[in-house]
Amino acid sequence: MRPNFLVIMTDQERYPPPYESEAVAAFRRTLAGHERLRDGGAHGAVELHRHYAASTACVPSRTSLFTGHYPSLHGAAQTDGLAKSAGDPRVSWLDPSTVPTMGDWFRAAGYRTEYRGKWHISHADLFATGTHESLRTVDRKGTVDAVAVDAYRRTSRLEPWGFAGWIGREPHGAYLGDTGLVRDPLFAQQADELFADLRDEERPWLSVISLVNPHDIAFSTLQDNFGFPVPDDAVPEVDAAPSQADALDDRPQVQQQFHDVWPQMLIPQPTDATYRRFYYWLHALADRAITTVLDALDAHGHGDDTIVVFTSDHGEMLGAHGGLQQKWYQAYDESIHVPFVVRGPGIAPAPAGVDIATSHVDVLPTLLGLAGIDETIAATVVGEDHVEVHPLVGRDLSALLRGETTVDAVDAPVYFMADDDISRGDRQRNLLTGEPYEAVAGPARVESVLARIASGPGGAPELWKLTRYFTELGEDGDWPEEWELHNLARDPEERTNLAAHPGSDPVPELHQMQAVLDLTRDRKRLTPRFTPRG
């Protein structure tokens, strides 16, 4: 009998950084939902400690996770909001007839597939007739509009992307009713209702519960207006990242530019103690919803036959690396290193977890493997109504999770790419004041590779990260590419760029990692079969 699957996602939750204090670590251990995910209960649980987003920010990351491919293939490379509306010509959403989603793959194998919560892969909102105004289901106070909810249920807006049951609108933007504070408890309630309905389901099922927080960090300066000040005793003091004091003048130039333009795009948000404590309090808010979801899963009798997967779409800089915020224009661990836990029947207990680098593009092939779904056979089915069905570029880690193979047998380089230029669009004006601002210039595209190479004592393997900043041919300006190279084993905070030492010979690992990047890019950065002809 095939297992059920529950995918729980948060938004903007980073993996704990190496400089986290014991007080903050102790606070995180009080988050009951997160602890239950890692514990596994009556079954095994595995935490993959070096898991990375495949892209940033929200739209490209989520689309990569749910398709198993990179933006170079699925095309959803830009995040709407701020400079871009959903209809901006620079924004390309996932077309439902091109690259199939996780829902499509599992439906092809006979699964029932459901989605609740933040989607942000296509613009799936219902609209008031004759307007561009999305149909809201919740007001600022959290009061639910039952008629609007019914409209979303009847129209099942995610059916073309392989999922049923989604209730909009998308929780995205600076409206209080779209914050995690308001929406996450409602998404947890929707999960409870879904699990009750699934008790009579004869088919195996895959359900996604996608939460908003800690994404509300984007509105930290508005927290009093929105009604969620941090309780005095809820979160300990959170120290600044050591790299917050670093200068940006020797970093890739796009970082200094984004550091300067971000306050002009939304609202100045000082990277102070209040800001940092607010971010961790948002973890606690998300954890309440996770706890409700897990309680409901058990209460409705699904706990023993459901594999639970937990991750986040991307992380948050929180002032690290010279005061950077959010997740754009770089590939530092604060931004792309995220939690990833798998627990449930058939998962071998691994109290110490797994330390090889893994990626969001590994998730889909791994879940197919855990379900016993043959990718080749399923590809034939999804290929009947999708024109861009390609072999999945990620690894199937199911044998590792079942304890049937070793980490060395599945270790491989991890690729990351980001073309998301959040500062550029048709409405380059401050979201609150309307004041115009200039978009960042220079090499704003980013690609990165993580790989273990034999650089340690006695040839021991060490994890390295190489990041390239570049522009594409035909883009504005003639900008030279820029590089960052970090030995994560010896420099886990990424403060010493081994690729930038003018006047001296480059370290030998630079050329090694550049070769790894070229090879990994060729294997994983696929492009569509169907492209415009000149």
Q: Which residues are covered by each model-predicted region?
A:
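Short, structured active-site-proximal loop/turn typified by the sulfatase FGly-forming signature C/S-X-P-X-R
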Residues: Y19-T63, G68-L73, R112-T113, L510, ...
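Active-site-proximal N-terminal segment of extracellular/periplasmic enzymes that hydrolyze or transfer
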Residues: M1-V46, E493-S504
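Catalytic-site neighborhoods of secreted/periplasmic enzymes
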Residues: H43, T67-P185, D197, F219-L222
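Active-site-proximal cap/lid insertion segments
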Residues: Q12-F27, L198-R203, L211-D305, V309-T358, ...
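Core domains of carbohydrate- and sulfate-ester-processing enzymes
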Residues: S61-R62, A109, H123-E170, H215-Q269, ...
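C-terminal, low-complexity/hydrophilic appendages and adjacent surface loops
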Residues: I121, Y332-D333, M417-A499
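Catalytic-adjacent loop/helix segments of enzymes that bind and process anionic phosphate/sulfate esters
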Residues: T155-P214, P270-T271, Y275-W281, L285
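Polar, surface-exposed loop/tail segments
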Residues: L31-A32, C58, L65, K118, ...
